[in-house]
Amino acid sequence: MSSLDEDEEDFEMLDTENLQFMGKKMFGKQAGEDESDDFAIGGSTPTNKLKFYPYSNNKLTRSTGTLNLSLSNTALSEANSKFLGKIEEEEEEEEEGKDEESVDSRIKRWSPFHENESVTTPITKRSAEKTNSPISLKQWNQRWFPKNDARTENTSSSSSYSVAKPNQSAFTSSGLVSKMSMDTSLYPAKLRIPETPVKKSPLVEGRDHKHVHLSSSKNASSSLSVSPLNFVEDNNLQEDLLFSDSPSSKALPSIHVPTIDSSPLSEAKYHAHDRHNNQTNILSPTNSLVTNSSPQTLHSNKFKKIKRARNSVILKNRELTNSLQQFKDDLYGTDENFPPPIIISSHHSTRKNPQPYQFRGRYDNDTDEEISTPTRRKSIIGATSQTHRESRPLSLSSAIVTNTTSAETHSISSTDSSPLNSKRRLISSNKLSANPDSHLFEKFTNVHSIGKGQFSTVYQVTFAQTNKKYAIKAIKPNKYNSLKRILLEIKILNEVTNQITMDQEGKEYIIDYISSWKFQNSYYIMTELCENGNLDGFLQEQVIAKKKRLEDWRIWKIIVELSLALRFIHDSCHIVHLDLKPANVMITFEGNLKLGDFGMATHLPLEDKSFENEGDREYIAPEIISDCTYDYKADIFSLGLMIVEIAANVVLPDNGNAWHKLRSGDLSDAGRLSSTDIHSESLFSDITKVDTNDLFDFERDNISGNSNNAGTSTVHNNSNINNPNMNNGNDNNNVNTAATKNRLILHKSSKIPAWVPKFLIDGESLERIVRWMIEPNYERRPTANQILQTEECLYVEMTRNAGAIIQEDDFGPKPKFFI
């Protein structure tokens, strides 16, 4: 065929395609086409050549041509494209003369994309197919793009739903959380050592601890095995704190300490000590030990010498033994009758203007002992010479409240004339002034922290003159704890301690107030020290840590002692506590309870209508929050929640649904308050464990007269508690099981003495009195006196022989009228 004929055929083909295109445009779209096909190019004639058409307004012309370019490039290697090599193709033989229907069906069956991959241009092995047909492209778009769009919409909707979907667990009421199931790490560890920021010297850590507080360890005994406050702290910590704070201590290693043999002054003092033994107020029992030390040992073990000197201050003032009898007179209104301060004359003094003498504790004695002769005489306030001995005893409060301004007339002993001593005292006083609590080291010994609250810090101290331990609460006013509240607390403590009424019963369950003073911007309240810590620490260490519960007898004793304390402050002092919780209930050496921390307390009726004192939300009464109503019965409500916490071993909530349920009188989340297993580890207890719930149910069923049905009902009711796997059906097996269980209960009941009162084994009396105490309407709650007048409390108070936390077997001691 000639070239002319070929050109004519090509022209006819092009003309045919144009006519088809114009025909579509004139007569409308075919069935199944949309508006996007109006400008489709290419018709149905197979072609593999790039063609340009003179339609400038056709937007798909260039894109279709570009598609033709990519389809015609069959030589492109799969390695050059990360998408081309992943397309799956069907390996089929190409048949000649395949019509348009077969191509469309193949496109419908072809899945060239993997999941989660973007759409790419399909590559086939065909070199000339109807791949640029508008119908094929339309079907291609309809098959794949709607699915991808739908997938994108679903993904976006699900992601937005997951973000906006609330946490469903927030609507689930979990109730009260048992302390048994909680990790012990959630509870704060008891403070065993003082929080001292000073780094200890390695020489101090290697010292011998055999002679530390031998006298105090003899008296350190308790009915409890472990007590937070009875823990004997390492006395070296306070010594390190004060000794290391002084910058002059860095120069101490280079100072030569003269021996006793080479010091004329020490020899004179040593012989003078033998001649005037009855004229001195302080005697050092360790002088003989230090005298026998060699110079090398004395110099290398200087830290040990400080320790010996610390224990060497022993007062021989016999008048101090009578100071406790006259303490109240000396503390309130009799200080002005004291004679003028005594001037201690000293012929060794070389100072022209002696500085005022201050009451010095272990700190001054230790530092002076470090660089001076060990046999020198020490002097503290109240220690007089033979010619100036006074017959009036020295009061405890006057020694404590002594300030630097009021002691200007006292003289310093002769050994304080050293320039280095004066420099050390000046530097140390500047450092101590930075922390007001540091002045306690000058007035007391063995000072260490035993607790820290939101507004205060509590220290345990020892008064050197009487060797008696006290607790000092340091409070610094701030915007959350005003000065007015601090002064009110001191006033209330003073009033409660000195309250003289006809009925003094219950006063022994209130913390004893000793003294108070102000130093710089802080206030200090001195009270008696309860060696066994507080009730909260006892519950954590002796109950929760051992995975057990208190028996009902001790719980009733706690109710009795705290009710006695509340009745005294309510009826005799007209004071409401408003912050009753286990952390504010102290435990004495004998195991009795004492109510302390009157920081939220106030007098009733209120004088200030704007008064707003709220304790912890876990124990606060509902009327205080809702109506700002303050009544004595708010303390009764707090006592009731304390018993719920102690008896059920649960953590009281501070908000939420469980919080509101407790304030509506609902105890369903707490479970049974009476212990279902009252067997204890006491030496007087039998090996057999007694389930008081089964015993009470058995007695109740016998009274009903229908032992079989009632026995079956009893087993059914208690199946969740005693035997969760028991079948709850009503067949003969259950009747036999109930009879067997009743016989077992009879065997167990024989282990319970006949004199045991019913309220200790019925499982209902404790819950009944707790519901009475947490009555939502405060007017229906009992008073402290009404609680004490119940039969249960009268029996407990009449028969108990020990403190509230002391175990007295499972059911308490046997009453004397049964003996």
Swiss-Prot record:
Sample GO molecular function, one term: protein serine kinase activity
Binding site for ATP: I450, G451, K452, G453, Q454, F455, S456, T457, V458, K473
Outcome recorded upon mutating Q807 to R/E: Prevents degradation
Record cross-link Glycyl lysine isopeptide (Lys-Gly) (interchain with G-Cter in ubiquitin), residues: K741
SMART domains, A to Z: S_TKc
Domain Protein kinase: 444-794
Entry keyword annotation includes Amino-acid biosynthesis: no
Sites where the protein binds Mg(2+): N584, D597
Residue positions, PTM Phosphoserine: 36, 56, 63, 70, 102, 105, 111, 118, 127, 133, 136, 156, 169, 201, 225, 254, 262-263, 266, 284, 294, 312, 345, 379, 395, 438, 610
PTM comment: Ubiquitinated by the SCF(MET30) complex, leading to its degradation by the proteasome.
Region called Disordered, residue ranges: 86-105, 117-168, 278-297, 341-395, 707-736
Catalytic activity entry: L-seryl-[protein] + ATP = O-phospho-L-seryl-[protein] + ADP + H(+); L-threonyl-[protein] + ATP = O-phospho-L-threonyl-[protein] + ADP + H(+)
Source organism superkingdom: Eukaryota
Alphabetically ordered keywords of this record: ATP-binding, Cell cycle, Cell division, Isopeptide bond, Kinase, Magnesium, Meiosis, Metal-binding, Mitosis, Nucleotide-binding, Nucleus, Phosphoprotein, Serine/threonine-protein kinase, Transferase, Tyrosine-protein kinase, Ubl conjugation
Active site: D579 (proton acceptor)
Family: Belongs to the protein kinase superfamily. Ser/Thr protein kinase family. WEE1 subfamily.
Protein known as: Mitosis inhibitor protein kinase SWE1
Species whose genome carries this gene: Saccharomyces cerevisiae (strain ATCC 204508 / S288c)
